Design a protein with these regions (language model features):
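Positively charged n-region of N-terminal signal peptides that target proteins for export
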Residues: 1-5
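Sec/Tat signal peptide C-region and signal peptidase I cleavage site
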Residues: 15-19
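A short, structured loop/turn motif at beta-sheet edges
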Residues: 20, 42-46, 73-74, 108, ...
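Extracytoplasmic/periplasmic copper-protein system
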Residues: 20-29, 70-92, 134-147
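N-terminal edge beta-strand
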Residues: 21-47, 58
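Short beta-strand and strand-turn-strand segments in soluble, beta-rich domains
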Residues: 33, 87-101
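Extracellular/periplasmic metallocenter environments
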Residues: 53, 58-60, 101-147
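Short Gly/aromatic-enriched secondary-structure transition segments
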Residues: 62-70
Length: 147
């Protein structure tokens, strides 16, 4: 019993020391909502992967979703540039240094993954994520907590 208890304690300690949250899962729906309002990004991870699943059924041209990450101070400036004429391939956004990360746009039933180099984020700054499909950002956005 003593050996079992020792091994149990060791495994718990090892899990808390070595565990890191380097993979985030988000779902978007046909109701123009993410299933989370905040995500936590761990800077101890060199890379973090965000997996976005579109849990709805509507096609990409009617209800596409993606994940865009910007500094909170730039949210208004970036969202004002969203335009259908820029196309789904670009997430309806022009190229901009203010866009730190952007995933591919997906339609109902599809999933996209965004690999992020965590060195591009600064713990002293505030970040947000949002969907850049025209009109979605007003409801589909959230805060990013960096630890």
């Amino acid at each position: 019993m003593k050996i079992f208890f020792t091994m149990l304690c060791a495994s718990i300690l090892a899990t808390s020391v070595f565990a890191s949250n380097c993979e985030i899962k988000i779902e978007g729906s046909d109701m123009m909502k993410y299933d989370v309002a905040e995500i936590t990004l761990d800077t101890s991870c060199e890379q973090t992967k965000i997996s976005l699943k579109h849990a709805g059924k509507l096609p990409i041209n009617a209800m596409g979703h993606n994940v865009v990450i910007v500094e909170e101070k730039n949210l208004s400036k970036i969202t004002q540039q969203i335009n259908f004429s820029l196309g789904v391939e670009k997430g309806y956004l022009p190229e901009s240094e203010d866009i730190i990360f952007i995933s591919a746009m997906v339609g109902g039933g599809d999933t996209t993954e965004l690999e992020m180099d965590m060195s591009k984020l600064d713990k002293t700054k505030s970040y947000v994520f949002f969907c850049s499909f025209p009109g979605h950002w007003a409801l589909m956005r959230g805060k990013i907590k960096i630890i």
